[in-house]
Amino acid sequence: MTDRVRLYEIAREMGCDNREVLEVCEQLGIPFKSHSSTISPEQAELVRSKLSEPRVVKPTRPRLRPKLQPESSQPQPPVEAKASERPQHIVGIRRPAPAQQQAAAGEASSSKPSPQRPDQLSSEKGAAGGSLELIGPPRRQVDPPARPAAQEPQPAAASTRPEAAAKAGSPEPSPAPAAKRPTVLPPPRRAASGPEPPQRAPESRRPGLAEAPSPSGARTSPPVEEKVSLPQAEQRPRPQLVGAPVRPGTRPEPRSPVAKKEESSDSGKADEAPRPQRRLELVGPPTRPVAKPLPPEPDASPRLPEGIPEERPTPVLAEAPVRPAAPKLKRKTVEEEDEELQALERRAGRTQAKRKRSRRREEGDGDVLDLDPLTVLSSVKQAELNALKPLARPTAKPPSYRPPAAAARPRPAAERPQRPSASAEATAPEAAAESLPEEKVLLLEGSLTVQELARRLRVAETEIIKTLFFKGVRVTINQVLDESLAESVAKELGYEVRRPEAEPKAKKTEILDLEDIDHLVPRPPVVTIMGHVDHGKTTLLDAIRHTNVAQREAGGITQRIGAYHVDVDFEGQKRRIVFLDTPGHQAFTAMRARGARVTDIAVLVVAADDGVQPQTLEALSHARAAQVPIIVAINKIDKPGSQPERVKQQLAEHGLLPEEWGGDTPMVEVSALTRRNLDALLEMILLVADVAELQANPNRPARGTVIEAHLDKARGPVATLLVQNGTLRVGDTLVAGAVLGRVKAMMDDRGQRLQEAGPSSAVQLLGLEEVPAAGDEFQVYADEKEARRIAEERAEALRQARLQQALLSRRVSLGSISAKAQEGQLKELNLIIKTDVQGSAEAIQTALQDLPQEEVRLRVLLAAPGEITETDVDLAAASDAIILGFNTSFAPGARQAADDKGVDVREYDIIYNLLDDLRAAMEGLLEPEEVEEPLGQAEVRKVIPISRGAVAGSYVLSGKVQRNALVRVRRKGEVVYQGRLDSLKRFKDDVREVAAGFECGIGIEKFDAWQEGDLIEVYQMVTKRRTLAPA
């Protein structure tokens, strides 16, 4: 098959088109599929010989365009050009004319003399196939300058094939009278003609052009090349042909014979309109100087009456490749045509150079396109151009569209300089760091996000991310870094890290203003009872108040802060003391700190039999941070085994030296049960208060601190407030933290309603919109709008703090994430905490943070005071959470909802039990671990050979030996085998186990290299519940 020849190679060799080669193959009966098909050498020779003979050139090649010669005024022989051009035998019919007139038009066109074609060689093979056989080479570009005159199609020659129509359309050199029919002159350069011919020409040529494509292969070739100029007489009737559809989509219809177009001139016009190429060609005379084949214009006028009546002045475009030399397309509307005619008149007197410039300027105009005859575009490109021109009907659209596009381009260019500036914002901190001569010092106050750290270090976020990436930590811009990781990054970037001194939580706040100095009056002291758990704080307070609060407390421990008033007779006067009772459990650190912050005097209670304990030292640190005087009450001196002197010694070691030892710390030995020395304690409190000269201004809006708060199902949010300055009255508008409220009612610690509360008064307040946070400060405002604005600002700040806290839960550190957490095996336990008061919720959350969370992480979805409601149950069911109720109850329907949805609700009244159960639940989430449990040991005393190996005669040293248990054989301290014990016999009987002190035979299938003295360790693997690693 290597000697076979491809058809396109033959076409290239012969200098012809593939289509011509395919036609020859079809004529010779040579089978083929496409131009890439192969044929035998013999068949190739036949094709070459056939191609070398004169052949009919089909008008399907639109790309070959003979160039017009502006100088030639005489007819030129269209020998090859004629063949190359598609002879468009279209009889232009202005109006529906009878078939006889169409036939007459066809005869006139055929008999029409063409002075330009005397040299043409044309031979008519028949009426059906009247096509011209050109003897010249197949390439039609040989005679580009020769512009064939417009060929007139012969109706008789019209056939279904466009080739036959093209052949028949080519007029013979017979000198038929031109007056009978307006002949479409070849490319007549009628630029010299007056402005009138151009005006009429576009009108008359449009119908003719539109008709021309229909009869002969209009579809095969967009003959835009030739520009035919019609006589003025023919052009005048043309204005009637105005609205042929310009859409090029109708071009495929021209395949129909010429007779069909003659039958309906209107339909022909519609078909012709899609071919904007024809219209462009007809405008040629005014725009391009084309050689005039027929110099006498009067001849054209007599042609009309002789050959065709005025009703049918449609010029017959014999030559299919009529170039749209004057592509002055007449639009469908009459107004557009008038505008085009005016434009033609203005351009008629311009020079050739001006025409070229105007053509470039008017490319966007669909109306006029001036083409220079010397610059002839290819037929394909011209066809595409003409197809696009009619689509842009509004002449102003293209130009109006282009300027905005051009204007849009500079805009992005102008914006581009801004983008670098925007992107430079990321690197701006670096530049600022370089320009600032400040020291590279980072004040690290806690965990930071990557973005915040980059801003403080004045570097780009990408620099931080890159530095961490090299450390093996992948972070995002919003991820939170712990202090150690942020410190390492800062040091690597050359910064010195400093940490601010931690401000104590119990630091006392100043509530007096300068304007209060002139209105100060003495106020009662606020005394906070502090100490370790079970040292008798509440019992001591009950003994002072003559109450029994301690007996009503769950578990006998205080788990909430309380405020009480006590009236004492001192030096013949009634003196009031406000006591704050704080819990002693380690989880209630915040409560103790809050009590120390608002107190005036701290009473440190220490049990004489227990001495100084951790919470004693913590309370001491809070009191010192608040810089308040300390009074030590050594309690339980009546208890056997009490050692008050040892307690004083311990306190002295921590900086509290008793007054009797030469110190400045008052110490009173008391007994709450026997009420011993209680008066001495109260007297000491009042003496210290007098020394401190406690004062306040009662004639100002109240200010103070929220001691405790809770949600009451009947009364709503209830807050215990300590008024530290000013006077609080019913009806006042106040802001407590971020909560707005109006005082609806006030009650003291005994439940009596009050209308006002002065300085150092502890009251329960009703009327707040929400439950405030314990420890928040409150202030009364005269303007409610101002109060609401302040509350909203604080609420927004609180939301941001919560968001920061949520980010902290996703913080990244180098050592806090365990390997299992990195592998996605970190367990999570979701919790919903409901307590009686807000302080208890805070204490529980603080205690949860102390639990180890490297393998099981605790997520507190909600922690708030109040009852357990159905909403809480729904949240727990949706998030698979556990509800922890602390000293609270169920709302109506909540317990039933929890049972229906299977929500686990745990109720507690002692914080110890809550934390113990929570730790157990966390351990339950851990996967149990397998541990080795030893069973016994045996020593090999004798090796007994058997047929299948050897058996170890052993003596059980300790424990027991079980069959199928795991064994480890040690020889001189090294393990020589580890596997399973398969056979265990005592004498000749199989036994399940052998106890210590007995002999037995041990056999293992996969091991028989026993030696005397080997030690056999018997053990088993058991699963054991894991416990949380210490934090």
UniProtKB/Swiss-Prot annotation:
Residues that coordinate or bind GTP: 531-538, 581-585, 635-638
Subcellular localization, as worded in the UniProt entry: Cytoplasm
Biased composition annotated in UniProt, kind: Pro residues: 184-200, 286-299
Stretches with biased composition (Basic and acidic residues): 45-56, 250-281
Segments for region (G4): 635-638
Biased composition (Low complexity): 96-105, 148-171, 419-435
Entries under PROSITE patterns matching the protein: G_TR_2, IF2
Domain of life: Bacteria
Biased composition (Polar residues): 108-123
Pfam family, one: GTP_EFTU
Main location: cytoplasm
Region annotation G5: where it falls in the sequence: 671-673
Region (Disordered): 33-369, 388-436
Record flagged with keyword Protein biosynthesis: yes
Domain tr-type G, residue spans: 522-695
Region feature (G3): 581-584
Family in the record: Belongs to the TRAFAC class translation factor GTPase superfamily. Classic translation factor GTPase family. IF-2 subfamily.
Role according to the record: One of the essential components for the initiation of protein synthesis. Protects formylmethionyl-tRNA from spontaneous hydrolysis and promotes its binding to the 30S ribosomal subunits. Also involved in the hydrolysis of GTP during the formation of the 70S ribosomal complex.
PANTHER family listed in its UniProt record: TR-TYPE G DOMAIN-CONTAINING PROTEIN (PTHR43381:SF5), TRANSLATION INITIATION FACTOR IF-2-RELATED (PTHR43381)
Name of the protein described by the UniProt record: Translation initiation factor IF-2
Annotated organism of origin: Synechococcus sp. (strain JA-3-3Ab)
Gene this chain is encoded by: infB
